[in-house]
Amino acid sequence: RSTLFPYTTLFRSTNRDVYDQAFELAVNAEVRRGIVEDGVRPDGRKLDEVRPLSSQVGILPRVHGSSLFTRGVTQALNIITLAPLSYAQEVDTMETTGGKRYYIHHYNAPSYTVGEPGRIGSPGRREIGHGYLAERALIPVLPTIEEFPYTIRSVTEIMSQNGSTSMAATCSSCMALMDAGVPIKNPVSGVAMGLMIDLPKNQEITAQDIDKAYVLTDLMDAEDFAGDMDFKVTGTKNGVTALQMDMKVHGLPVEIMEKAIKQSHAGRMFILEHLTTVIKSPRKELSKYAPKIEKLMINPEKIGAVIGKGGEMINRITAETGAEVDIEDSGLVTIASSDATKIKKALDWIKSLVEEPEVGKIYEGTVISIKDFGAFINIMPGIDGMLHISQITDKRLNKVTEVLHEGDEIRVRIIAIDDKGRISLSMRNLD
């Protein structure tokens, strides 16, 4: 405001906002002049220089994974929570239904992070957009649910900010995922690129103007407000995973975009090297506080046997074992619990429901009906076999009821399965 003091007589009857706008324009003009004429940024950095970096992992011992990423004044705390697949977010759009998100990134940046008071309410467009960009940045390197049967929630809490918070969210979530033991394919880093063009406003930019285009690595707030572009790039050592760009000009030639992408690669690699010095690869074991999950692939045709009529069977398994059971349409079954004994009990139960009958194997069965020629035995849920009277004992029998009665529990061996799937059983020579 002291800069504008000589001119205050011109604004005595003007709203205070005019002063604020004039001051902002003066600052923006000075930021642009420093970069274009002197090649110096507001904090003294070179055009391709990244702010000082500092990071930690495992700073919150009770959560499943955590990290703190600091770049200059911008600081992001990330927390990872692992849960069974049933916790996936159901997604319905105008075009599709039934989609699920197994990786969810939530981004929060309260007013206090920029030194202002304010209410904390539902997320706005900025929070949703930044969270979605950081989410998209990590999706290409995440394991499949078959490889890692967990729903993953990543929450970034911005602690302080001066530009590039979405890229800080990307870096902090990458480190927290590795701290949690999520087997990501490669670490991911992100950097925001800026642009100052030394041309009159509204003048068309051509390829010949590339020498007048000043590309900035690791954009800060003052440069974002004064500049012509905010271009966010995330990726691994092998390639780019996400891009997002805002422009204040009417278009950019390919040559300037190429320059920005090449310069962003150097910035990303510098940040990536820093991340991998803090945590090089995903931890081999999950947190002791994370739920234990076992997976089993079954024939999709057997899903009905596990679920049962009206969900009766799966509800019974959950109630009697205390484990949580989820089934995907692909046949992937996941069993989750904090107790390994409960998981094993549920797993064995499900295996017995979906097991295919095997010739030569001995089963515990129940006599379900008696006929003159033999008996029908239930050996597995939904699977019966026929025990001929000649296969009950080595001695000759006149009636099946001399040995067997409905409801008897007996041991039988499968001796044959014909091409129609009919099973022949025997009680002879079981030892």
Q: Language-model segments: which ranges?
A:
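Short, small-residue-biased leader/transition segments that mark boundaries at the very start
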Residues: 3-10
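Short, hydrophobic beta-strand segments
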Residues: 8, 154-156, 160, 243-248, ...
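Conserved phosphate/anionic-ligand binding catalytic regions in large, soluble enzymes, centered on
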Residues: 57-80, 162-183, 304-314
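Glycine-rich, flexible beta-strand/loop modules in the N-terminal catalytic cores of phosphate-handling
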Residues: 59, 64-150, 239-249, 253, ...
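Structured alpha-helical segments in the cores of large, soluble enzyme domains
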Residues: 101-107, 111, 130-145, 177, ...
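Flexible hinge/switch segments at interdomain interfaces of large molecular machines
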Residues: 104-114, 145-149, 234-240, 250, ...
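Mobile "lid/hinge" segments at catalytic clefts and subdomain interfaces of large enzymes
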Residues: 177-284
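Single-stranded RNA-binding regions, centering on S1/OB-family and related RNA-binding modules
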Residues: 289-293, 300-431
